[in-house]
Design a protein with these regions (language model features):
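Extracytoplasmic/periplasmic domains immediately adjacent to an N-terminal transmembrane anchor
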Residues: 1-193, 361
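Membrane-interfacial helix-loop-helix junctions in multi-pass membrane proteins
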Residues: 96, 185-189, 321-376
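N-terminal membrane-entry
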Residues: 188-202, 366
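Long, hydrophobic alpha-helical segments
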Residues: 196-214
Length: 389
């Protein structure tokens, strides 16, 4: 600004007062939208709560048995398929009955014990036990197959030792490699620590895109955007209050979810700096709000904005590492993950909340998010100014 310093201060004061007034207007409008308030409360509270109750572990998977031997050895093997991982769902008379239960989804595992199972073990002959697993759910199928193989393998090992006359006392003189491992950051490997954090960060992403887009599109639908454009307000003074107001709402929802759901209910530790986490969340919200502004310039109504938001959200989530670890993805998709702001946000979220990491560890993720934020938010502002400026 050039000219008299007092005049420049007055202009600056006027600029910021208009920005504050527009932000207050956005917050008031938001507070009057009961349906939107309920939706946000649901996502930040009940959605994260439900995510914390989702388990990726194998618990009480139904096992049905076709026991063609009916011996003490077969009953002993069946006994090992017990809770918490498995539960016995009954016996079937033939292979086809077990296959039907797999087809109908009434069993996850069918254990098929052949005739002469006990006789072959006592005579030292090799014997086969067939395990059929429903792997339509890949994760559960893999876990069930792994646990079943471990149970059968251990049972066979114990039988071999017994046949060789090896006792538990004599085993103490055999050199063994002991597994001494330590699990960091989530010692009990609780899904209730992992799942709600992921869900919270995804909810923040959804809100950061949808709320600014919905606010701008609502102005277009009501025709009030034209009234704002003929006012003394600049396009920046029109769009920034929407982003600032929705960022404040998201930060409030995040705080409620963190303190009352994640920490209060699921006892998720908050080892790092909460100030750093909220600062990163603010930066991330502005970054993804740029996508919301871009969506608003392409949409004529809220339905179009919602559809376009889904088109943007799904690649961001798939490329974030929230559902699939980067190591399990093809090389090309691993490279594309660095273009997803959510990927860097999740890295920092886990680092701060579970690991207690600071900027000395997370600086590269923060730098990537800053660079993406500059590009995405600037592009959204440019599109908004081009359409409404």
């Amino acid at each position: 600004m050039n000219g008299d310093p007092a005049e420049n201060r007055a202009r600056l004061y006027l600029w910021w007062s208009r920005l504050a007034a527009m932000t207050a207007k956005e917050l008031i409008q938001f507070g009057r939208d009961t349906l939107l308030l309920v939706a946000i409360a649901y996502l930040f509270v009940f959605d994260t709560y439900m995510a914390g109750n989702v388990s990726m572990q194998l618990n009480h998977a139904v096992v049905v048995v076709h026991d063609a031997d009916h011996s003490a050895a077969s009953r002993e093997l069946i006994y090992h398929f017990r809770p918490p991982h498995f539960r016995l769902g009954g016996e079937v008379q033939d292979h086809r009955a077990g296959q039907r239960l797999l087809d109908q989804g009434q069993a996850l595992v069918v254990l098929d014990i052949p005739p002469h199972f006990e006789r072959d073990i006592l005579q030292g002959k090799p014997t086969d036990v067939q395990v059929q697993v429903d792997a339509s759910n890949t994760v559960l199928g893999f876990l069930a197959s792994s646990y079943a193989a471990q149970i059968i393998g251990q049972y066979g090992f114990d039988q071999a030792l017994a046949r060789l006359g090896v006792t538990e006392r004599s085993m103490q003189n055999v050199p063994m490699i002991r597994d001494e491992h330590r699990v960091w950051y989530n010692p009990n490997q609780k899904d209730a620590w992992f799942m709600p954090i992921v869900e919270l960060l995804i909810v923040i992403t959804i809100m950061a895109i949808m709320l600014p887009a919905a606010a701008a599109v609502r102005e277009k639908e009501r025709g009030t955007i034209e009234q704002l454009l003929v006012s003394p307000l600049t396009p920046i003074q029109i769009l920034l209050p929407k982003v600032i107001a929705m960022t404040l709402v998201i930060l409030l929802g995040t705080a409620v979810s963190l303190f009352f759901v994640l920490h209060g209910i699921f006892d998720v530790p908050m080892k790092g700096s909460l100030a750093l986490f909220f600062a990163v969340t603010t930066l991330y919200t502005f970054t993804t709000a740029g996508l919301g502004l871009y969506i608003a310039t392409l949409s004529r109504n809220l339905a179009q904005a919602a559809m376009l938001a889904i088109l943007v959200l799904m690649p961001m989530i798939f490329l974030s590492g929230a559902w699939t670890p980067p190591e399990a993805m093809p090389a090309g998709m691993r490279e594309a993950m660095f273009l997803s702001p959510l990927y860097h946000f999740i890295e920092m979220g886990y680092g701060i909340l579970l690991k207690g990491a600071g900027l000395d560890v997370l600086w590269d993720s923060l730098l990537s998010l800053v660079l993406l934020g500059i590009v995405i938010f600037s592009f959204g502002v440019w599109r908004f100014k081009r359409q409404f400026g």
